[in-house]
Amino acid sequence: MKTLDDLETQLGGFAGRRVLVRSDLNVPLDHDRRDGAGQPVITDDGRLRASVPTLRRLLDAGARVVVTAHLGRPKGAPEAKYSLAPVHARLAELLPGVEVGFCPVTVGAQATAAVDALADGELLLLENIRFNAGETSKDDEEREAFADELAALADAFVSDGFGAVHRKHASVYDVALRLPHAAGGLVATEVEVLQRLTAHPERPYAVVLGGSKVSDKLGVIDNLLGSLLGEGDRLLVGGGMVFTFLKAQGYEVGKSLLETDQLDRVAGYVRTAREKGVELVLPTDVVAATAFAADAEHDVVAVDAIPADRLGLDIGPDSGAAFAARLADARTVFWNGPMGVFEMEPYSHGTRAVAQALVDGGAFSVVGGGDSAAAVRTLGFADERFGHISTGGGASLEYLEGKHLPGLDVLS
């Protein structure tokens, strides 16, 4: 992949050049809370902060930076709740001394005029790219036509939205075919980290998987047990997905989340792990509640004694300690998915135990985006206490599955 330095050389410098940057600014918003300007409150600005170094590098070199990004999943038309206006306000705060403008459209005469008005070292954020049907269209002609409009706004393209590189979208894939291009610093770092996880990881290698559904992790488990993990490595499973693992081994799980259609496949994972010498670590106790609510009656119970009228919402304290012990001497750790419903304090302790184990251990630890990143920040852990916090949940998983990611392939 070309770097920013390569692109700067190719262009003869960034000064005066219009550079279209595809960033990942897809941050969580709390629409029930408002800031001083009346905008929804951003609850985790990690992706914004991760985007700043690439933007600052271009701005300091005199580029006229045009940023495009998505927020949420609008259906190809404007929806007020998905506007990037709150993101614009926070981005301006993160770039002091920079003129940061906002354009309420993405392409067309208004966008062209706004880009033309930029001076060297200024930035323009375009409105949500997914307000345009062409961005995500499965029709190649429609998507490519939209990419033509985007490319007309710039002299070069920088791909820095790692969280979207697994999508064959106009602003991720097609624009790169139309302009001189390079990977931004964030994308380059993410790829370097993932290569470290897949090429020659230090061992013992421990992978911690959580989240609600095992069906969301099938591809990555297939690849982990098929090639990445070997004898002496560990696969630790928690979160809602663990109840399918427990049921596959004969345990009753009450009203806990269960994917009955995956039981046979999960039973196969258990056998494969045993045959390969991969230690499969499952909880021995869980926090079982009468309802999915923070104030519901709840108790710690053994996994062989989950009441029929209760659902598991976190791994228990004994399991948290056991997980921490299996992570203590690991040399490489990848973690994707919380151990419980961390947003509710009674069910946050398992996730906290895993996070603390990574902080205390000596492994190169990677927190795999999405809910995992939100969890560690919500629980008060600083980013720098981990080896790397990825900005790409789905993209990271697909990379670990061994899939080709369109947004990376086009940069190669």
UniProtKB/Swiss-Prot annotation:
Listed name of the protein: Phosphoglycerate kinase
Catalytic activity field: (2R)-3-phosphoglycerate + ATP = (2R)-3-phospho-glyceroyl phosphate + ADP
Pfam families documented for this protein: PGK
Enzyme Commission code: 2.7.2.3
PANTHER family, A to Z: PHOSPHOGLYCERATE KINASE (PTHR11406), PHOSPHOGLYCERATE KINASE 1, CHLOROPLASTIC-RELATED (PTHR11406:SF23)
Pathway: Carbohydrate degradation; glycolysis; pyruvate from D-glyceraldehyde 3-phosphate: step 2/5
GO annotation terms (biological process): gluconeogenesis; glycolytic process
GO cellular component: cytosol
Lineage, uppermost ranks: Bacteria, Bacillati, Actinomycetota, Actinomycetes, Kineosporiales
GO MF entries: ADP binding; ATP binding; phosphoglycerate kinase activity
Recorded superkingdom: Bacteria
